[in-house]
Amino acid sequence: MQLEIVSPEKTIFSGEAKSVHLPGSEGHFQVLNNHAPIVSTLKKGKILIDGVDNNPESDLLNFSNGKASLEINSGVVEMKKNKLIILVD
């Protein structure tokens, strides 16, 4: 799936991912390739991304062995047409 993580200041990540684990307001959930359309709010926690290449342009993500993580305070996520957009604070 195409993944885009955006903050008010800049685009944190843009690229392909196999799966994304998110801290939803009502509990953690995972989004996989070709997931059904969804819109959800996010609470403070960690976004875990699997199946990514190291992206030297992203100084906010922590990379290790094809995985990445990002601590957030809150956000909103939308999955539509195999593109996951995460707006974070």
Where are the regions a protein language model picked out?
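Compact, glycine-rich, soluble single-domain proteins
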Residues: 2-89
